[in-house]
Structure formats: structure tokens, C-alpha cells
Design a protein with these regions (language model features):
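Extended alpha-helical assembly domains of large eukaryotic scaffold proteins
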Residues: 1-178
């Protein structure tokens, strides 16, 4: 017996915009997960409410079974890409573990500093990209060398020492010194 759910979807289409406009993003996400229509969430997300929405999606994915968790993460990735938050999108792509998604995210970012940050993230998660060929090819020789160095973690120890010097924590301190 097939159930006509057009009335239900009509109500959902009225409730979701209301929740998204009135800071009830988790309720909207829960409702869409329940009716299995999470795909329409991206249409209602704006720059103002994307952070709470994606944080909730990212948190929910840990508690969902195998195929549903990936769907939730894909929606979070799509929202981050829509609002041009590429480093957050890369964090979600690393959690998904899909090479094509990581490549798409890397290619979307044009800012060199954002690309450097993404290379640090990819190196940390153990997902190196081929930057000298393929879909993520970097044509600038200096940038290519720098990004490959970052992705190989070859300067990681030196970077930690620089951070320790900047924070002035190279030497142990007594409570009186602080």
C-alpha cells in the first residue's frame, strides 16, 4: 500500500524556511532527516545560518548508520562550498575520505593561503593530492614546491619550534614566572 505524502511534504516545505529564519536549524535538520529529504536543506541555508547548520550536521553524522552519515556529510560539504568556506569544506571532505571531493574542494579555492591551510589539513589526515599532475595541478613552480613541502610534513618539526618560540614556551617556567 503506497502512502500519499504530498500533504506531509507541503507542511515540511512550510516548516523548514520558518525554522531556518528563526534560529532553529537543528529542528529543521532533524525534520529533514526524518522525512529523508535532506537534499533540500542547502536551498534554505544562508551565510548567516550556515555555521550552526553545518556544525549540527557534522555532529549528527557521528551518530548515524553507515550510508546515512555520508549523505549528511555530503550535504554539509555542499553547504560549505555554497558559502565559499573552503577550509571547512575540506575538513568535511577529509572526514568523508573521498578523493574526488577533496580535489574538488582544493580546486575551488583560489587564495594561496587557503590552499596552504588545506595542504596542512590534508597532510594531517594522510590524504595527499598529486599537485604536479591531474585535476589539482598547480602550474606556478614556487607554489607547487611550497605546497608539496607542506603536504609531505617535512617542515613540521621546524614549524612547531617556530610556534613554541612565538608563544615563548621554549623553556619550562615556574608558576611564579607566569
Amino acid at each position: 500500500m503506497e502512502v500519499d505524502n504530498s500533504d506531509l511534504m507541503g507542511l515540511v516545505n512550510e516548516i523548514i524556511p520558518f525554522h531556518m529564519k528563526h534560529n532553529a536549524e537543528p529542528e529543521a535538520v532533524d525534520l529533514l532527516i526524518e522525512v529523508e529529504r535532506l537534499d533540500i536543506l542547502a536551498d534554505h541555508v544562508t551565510k548567516e545560518n550556515h555555521a550552526r547548520t553545518c556544525l549540527y550536521l557534522f555532529s549528527c553524522s557521528s551518530y548515524l548508520p553507515e550510508p546515512e552519515d555520508a549523505e549528511v556529510l555530503k550535504v554539509a560539504h555542499a553547504i560549505f562550498m555554497k558559502v565559499e568556506k573552503y577550509t571547512e569544506a575540506m575538513r568535511v571532505a577529509c572526514r568523508l575520505g573521498v578523493q574526488e571531493t577533496m580535489e574538488e574542494t582544493f580546486n575551488a579555492a583560489e587564495d594561496k593561503l587557503v590552499r596552504r591551510q588545506m595542504c596542512y589539513m590534508l597532510a594531517r589526515h594522510g590524504h595527499p593530492l598529486k599537485l604536479d599532475e591531474g585535476p589539482c595541478e598547480v602550474t606556478d613552480g614556487d607554489e607547487l614546491e611550497e605546497l608539496q613541502t607542506i603536504m609531505s610534513n617535512s617542515n613540521l618539526s621546524a614549524n612547531y619550534l617556530t610556534l613554541a618560540r612565538d608563544l615563548d614556551v621554549m623553556e619550562a617556567k615556574l608558576p611564579e614566572d607566569i
